[in-house]
Design a protein with these regions (language model features):
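Extreme N-terminal segment that seeds HTH/winged-HTH DNA-binding domains in transcriptional regulators
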Residues: 1-52, 56-68, 73, 79-86
């Protein structure tokens, strides 16, 4: 389950990107593995975020060079965050 704080000053998409980045950093989602789909992430958050919010979080990770979308396949981890696994 992904827990996000609706009342936090940090936008929901940033909170979600942070959670996913941490999972990548810890090796829970290793390089080469597909991230959960948007519908799976929506379910993991208990439906508190929209698909647009999820897409924005994935765009943040893509802009950081951590993930890449593959048409018809999903979004895959392509690199570790700075600092690697902890």
């Amino acid at each position: 389950m992904i827990e996000l704080d609706r009342d936090a000053m940090t936008p929901m998409y940033v909170q979600l990107a942070n959670v996913l980045r941490d999972r990548i950093r810890r090796g829970e989602i290793p390089v080469g593995r597909r991230l959960p789909s948007q519908s799976e992430l929506e379910e993991e958050t208990g439906g508190v975020v929209s698909r647009r919010t999820i897409k924005s979080a994935l765009e943040v990770l893509a802009d950081e060079g951590l993930v890449q979308g593959v048409q018809g396949k999903g979004v895959f981890v392509i690199a570790l965050p700075a600092g690697g696994q902890s």
